[in-house]
Design a protein with these regions (language model features):
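Catalytic palm active-site di-aspartate
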Residues: 92-104
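Active-site-flanking beta-strand signature of metal-NTP-handling nucleotidyl enzymes
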Residues: 52-57
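Long, positively charged amphipathic alpha-helical accessory segments at protein N-termini or as interdomain linkers
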Residues: 2-48, 60-89, 106-186
Length: 186
């Protein structure tokens, strides 16, 4: 592995450890690969200028059937991170279940992974929530069904800022879930 776990490249909240991949890396696949050995709080991200790609390893304490709700906590954290950097009055919506739209255009989405063969009635060894957001496109899309953060007015947004913001919001959502139940999160 050419990159090492290093928290110095991102301003992450306590409990997170960062692993940066080169441009062509797949953050989600890498997080799934190392989830069992690295554990909860491992945040894998890809160093790209055109795309935010991040995946976080989670270790739920409830059965897989309900632990999958972590997906909604991840999507809510993504929305909160985007809202913190979003131009005023920019419409942002989710298209069920995993797509994020800005002003009607596809800008990104999330996904959730768990170990093959995990028992629905037992806590899985790990979950991985992955998020991908388009920062910029080389050319303007012909159709209005796709967009980027740059095209929607997120000027000069560094991927590292958005990833760190996502991690902070994710931590808040999981803490809320732990203290007050899932209802305030989902």
């Amino acid at each position: 592995m050419s990159s090492a776990l290093s928290e110095t490249s991102l301003d992450l909240p306590p409990g997170f450890r960062a692993l940066a991949l080169r441009e062509l890396g797949d953050a989600f696949a890498k997080a799934v690969e190392i989830a069992g050995e690295q554990g909860a709080g491992t945040l894998v991200w890809t160093r790209r200028f055109d795309l935010v790609e991040v995946a976080v390893v989670l270790e739920p304490e409830e059965p897989l059937v309900t632990a999958r709700r972590a997906f909604f906590a991840g999507m809510s954290a993504a929305a909160d991170a985007l809202a913190a950097h979003c131009p005023p009055e920019k419409p942002m919506v989710f298209a069920w279940p995993d797509t994020i739209l800005l002003d009607g255009g596809l800008v990104g989405g999330g996904r959730l992974g768990w170990p093959d063969g995990a028992d629905e009635k037992k806590p899985p060894d790990w979950l991985v929530f992955g998020l991908m957001l388009r920062l910029m496109m080389p050319t303007a899309p012909a159709a209005r069904d796709r967009t980027s953060l740059e095209a929607e007015g997120f000027e000069m947004l560094e991927p590292r800022e958005l990833i760190a913001s996502f991690a902070r919001h994710l931590m808040v959502h999981f803490e809320t879930w732990r203290e007050r139940g899932f209802q305030p999160v989902g």
